[in-house]
């Protein structure tokens, strides 16, 4: 019986791996945000591996975006922002050799698990063709209690509309996590650090955060990055 139960658990673990992508809509752009934490002594090695997988991934069929980012205040933390034309393209990438080789090489220097969050877009916009060297990326994980999911979506869409009117906003998007509908990722690109500091003080931003507070299921987790 113990052997049989062990086999069931192993099978469930294997089956769970593609579930997050499988729960995404079959049509429409597929998005993925990945958080990576590396041993502090291995920052340079990780940056090199990220550049390699980015170069390979951008050549794959259906890739629309593959941004590799390094956190400004904790340089051993990285993020990947991906967009694929549809679920099929995202699944092909997830099962492909380039990503597998990247994960295999990354594993020995990881300080935490490979935190990959497939998502769908709820407030999206075209990516800029290029960004300046002073550009700052912000990624925020927003978690609300399940009854507040629809309200949060409406608020995120309004914040996106308001933010895109700011002169130094280069992109603002909100994604909804496939396997947890009450979890969201906000991705932003700003011309420079002063621009995002100004955005934080904007009336629309303060109004959003004030209203989000009572709805939240976790801390408002905003992280700032530079492009590699």
Protein language model annotation of sequence segments:
Residues 1-9:
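Bacterial N-terminal signal peptides that target proteins for export
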Residues 21-30, 67-76, 101-137, 171-180, ...:
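Glycine-rich beta-strand-turn "strand-cap" elements at beta-sheet edges
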Residues 30-37, 67-94, 134-143, 173-200:
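Short, well-ordered beta-strand segments in beta-rich or mixed alpha/beta enzyme
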Residues 42-64, 98-101, 146-170, 204-208:
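Short amphipathic alpha-helical segments
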Residues 150-228:
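Structured core of small recognition/catalytic domains
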């Amino acid at each position: 019986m113990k052997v049989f139960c062990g086999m069931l658990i192993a099978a469930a673990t294997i089956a769970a791996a593609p579930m997050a992508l499988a729960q995404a809509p079959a049509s429409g752009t597929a998005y993925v945000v990945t958080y990576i934490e590396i041993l502090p002594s291995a920052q340079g090695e990780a940056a090199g591996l990220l550049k390699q997988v980015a170069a390979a991934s951008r050549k794959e069929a259906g890739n629309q975006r593959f941004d590799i980012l390094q956190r400004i205040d904790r340089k051993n933390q990285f993020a990947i922002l991906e967009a694929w034309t549809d679920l099929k393209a995202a699944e092909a990438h997830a099962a492909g050799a380039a990503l597998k080789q990247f994960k295999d090489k990354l594993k020995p220097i990881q300080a935490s698990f490979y935190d990959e969050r497939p998502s769908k877009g709820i407030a999206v916009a075209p990516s800029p063709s290029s960004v300046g060297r002073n550009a700052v990326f912000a990624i925020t994980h927003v978690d609300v209690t399940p009854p507040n999911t629809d309200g949060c979506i409406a608020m995120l869409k309004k914040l996106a509309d308001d933010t895109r009117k700011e002169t130094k906003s280069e992109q603002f998007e909100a994604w909804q996590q496939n396997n947890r509908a009450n979890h969201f990722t906000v991705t932003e690109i700003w011309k420079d650090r002063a621009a995002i500091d100004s955005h934080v003080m904007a009336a629309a931003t303060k109004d959003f955060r004030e209203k989000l507070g009572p709805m939240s299921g976790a801390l408002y987790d905003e992280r700032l990055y530079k492009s590699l």
